[in-house]
Amino acid sequence: MMQFSGFWKKRSPVSLSEIRSILIVKLSAIGDVVHTLPLLEVLRKNLPDARIDWLIEEEASEIIKGHAALNRVIVSRRKLWQKNFVGSGRKSTTLKEIMSFLKELRSEQYDLVIDIHGLFKSGLLTGLARGRRKIGFTWAREGSTLFLSEPPFFEDQYRQHAIERYLKTANILGCDVASWNGRIPVDDSHRKMLDRLFRKNDLNGKRIAAINPMAKWDTKLWEPDRFSRLADRILEELGMRVLFTGSRHDQPALQEICRGMRNEGAVNLAGQIGLKELAALYTRCDVLITTDTGPMHIAAAMNCPVIALFGPTAPWRTGPYGNGHKVIREDLGCSPCFKKACSHKTCMKGITVGRVFYALMKQLDHKAPEKIRIAGHRRASLRALR
């Protein structure tokens, strides 16, 4: 039975002592799921014997599958179901899949359901789940708080990083939040695949700069020719190997970037590895240069230094979390605007290749061997800001 705001009751605060089972509702996207991993770890450390399940959509589910802190991952295939219901002959099969999913969702009576997502799609599933207490936050949108069992908690969304916002949930429950690492679990199968990839591309023992140039929002994109020029400078002036990462849908754009390069030494991995292999890959890279997108958060979670190019979004809310990262952005009155469409894109166009390359040199200076710093960095520095 779903609960609505008219049925909110004034109740005592949720206590750790009353929790034996938890459902986390965080459906997507990749970066948001990565940001929720610290909360998962903290809940498990404070409730070692509790059942903890996670409701997630298919696209980002690979990130959390096999996580030691989880008892079960419940996967919603919402996008596929919607596609099959529009102009498809698979309506009957799809309906059976949905019913099976709902049966799985409702198979457990949870002591606590936490809607971390805060949109209508998560609110509806929170309402459909069986839970004694259902909590969420005031920053939620689209009426999702109507499905909670009690008034939402107030949190200041704008001034806090997403990881810190989500950890406030654990604070509210009385958890000790001092210890977590937020890493994505990878196993030997993922590492062995990377071993084969590194042998194939002669990457073992090489210093590697990964570049992830794509993003879902058009306003987050940097111009392809700038990535081409940046990659050329990394190859020519720093003597590093360059790896491009992205999904199979990014393949045409990455091919365009590679065609725009003077050199042929870059490796295009678009569509060749999954999210777990990507996480393992970033542990072997010296740096990732990226737009504001999911792989940026994966790299940060795996302790790979990140140089992030920001335009329409706010790095203090969703930037790479932790030490050792660098955000490059233009200080404009219109940024952050959080718009997915823009006629001028001044915030991204204002970021020059030289500025990114200079940030890369400073990043590498901290960890580079002396001979590389002298042989590469000093020669490169003469042209760094062009």
Q: What do the PLM-derived regions correspond to, one by one?
A:
Residues M1-R386:
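Catalytic machinery of carbohydrate-active enzymes
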